[in-house]
Amino acid sequence: MCIRDRSRKDCVTTIGPHRANVVGVTNSTTQTDNLIKYFSSLASSSYGIFDSGYKYTYDRFNNKFRYIPTNGDIAGLMVRTNVVAYPWFSPAGQQRGIINNAIKLAYNPNKSQRDKLYPQRINAVVTQPGIGTLLFGDKTALGYASAFDRINVRRLFLTVEQALQKAAEAQLFELNDELTRANFRNIVEPYLRDVQAKRGLYGFLVVCDSTNNTPDVIDNNEFRADIFLKPAKSINYVTLTFVATRTGVSFDEVVGRV
């Protein structure tokens, strides 16, 4: 599925564990080991999203309670994020990551277990007192450090690439001259400024001129544009430092020294 998504470039795949990995397993350490073993065998891809969850919920069609995987919920969180925010926002956390209709989880990893799962590309689904059940991670299934190892960055590029592909196709069979290139830039740059204003980008650069549309490129009937994006990054760790200062000390003297 992830390979198909990589070729399509318009979707991602959400993948949950086997039922036997967590349901009916009473030892949480064993559940953790089962998940790591299962997901370690799956290929690296920024078009996949792994999660740990099975939720106990009411099946109204069969009038019974049952465990179901939460990977469908993760897909729903991304749709909800599109509605309440934008695709380049993370679908995890208390703001957009709450999973509905979960009575309990088959596996509710604690912090030490989450710290084992996250480096293995597994996003934990947890239940927190007073908050509910939520997605507590926003990694893709990419197996190495990259901007694309975060869900919001992958979905940002899916959105931008689709939009700009249409702008590029509109240049087909036009003359490859400065007027056409300027027209392309005038389409792309306002769109990217809008994405930046909506917090999806820290910055961008569009290069579409004679530097990349050289005489050889023009003679080959090609049109080239290089688009450089600085994607916004989600917060995965929060550090709070509290310092008690003496009454007579100026804050200017202590700020930056902690």
Locate each region found by the language model.
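Structured, hydrophobic secondary-structure cores that serve as assembly/anchoring elements
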Residues: R4-V258
